[in-house]
A protein has these predicted regions:
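Generic hydrophobic, amphipathic alpha-helix propensity
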Residues: 8-16, 33, 58-62, 66-70, ...
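An amphipathic alpha-helix signature
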Residues: 13, 88, 92, 96, ...
Length: 200
């Protein structure tokens, strides 16, 4: 592990993610996180005051990482892309980058429901901020797509910001009953395609 404080902090958060996924929030202790990280419990406390702060910091870390990946997808600048993507493909990929990491925790961890509840109670402000930031990015993408003639917002009688909100909320609702990531991806891609077809 690097001696950089930032790298140590991220290593602790990654270890916390593993422990929370394995045992849930309530059963995980600071000692568990320290052991998973490979450092002393005292070292953990030099970065975080308590488990609650670890949890909030982890939530912020995961949201920031998801938003960063979503931004790359919206721009279509992934290294694997060999040709420009249509706006529907970029938006669908960005939505999946934003919502799928959290959906995977819910569906793949035995403690997914508990973690989702804790996140809602302890990190609601972080969730709202992340949603607003993503919708702002999506609004910019839709505005650019309209300017470039890829979509026509006037056809749908929507402003870019309203369309962005509907797309995000609609895609988020598709998590309901999606038992795995493949199901969610299929739903999101179909939803975005149908939604944007109404703007052509």
């Amino acid at each position: 592990m690097s001696n950089s404080p930032q790298n140590k902090r991220e290593a602790i958060l990654e270890a916390a993610f593993t422990q929370f996924s394995r045992y849930g929030f309530r059963r995980t202790s600071m000692e568990d996180i320290a052991k998973e990280t490979g450092i002393s419990r005292a070292s953990i406390y030099s970065h975080f005051d308590n488990k609650e702060e670890v949890f909030r910091s982890l939530s912020a870390f995961l949201h920031d990482r998801a938003l960063g990946e979503a931004e790359v997808r919206l721009k279509g600048t992934e290294s694997s892309i060999k040709a420009p993507l249509q706006v529907s493909d970029r938006i669908a990929s960005a939505l999946l980058a934003k919502i799928n990491p959290f959906h995977k925790v819910l569906t793949e961890s035995a403690h997914g429901s508990e973690l989702a509840d804790e996140n809602s109670q302890r990190c609601g402000d972080l969730v709202r901020d992340s949603q607003e930031r993503f919708q702002s990015m999506l609004t910019q993408t839709l505005t650019s797509a309209a300017r470039d003639g890829e979509i026509d917002l006037k056809t749908a009688k929507l402003k870019a910001s309203a369309a962005a909100e509907l797309i995000y909320l609609g895609a988020s609702g598709l998590k309901q009953g999606a038992s795995d990531s493949a199901t969610l991806e299929k739903r999101v891609r179909n939803f975005v395609r149908v939604f944007l077809d109404g703007m052509i």
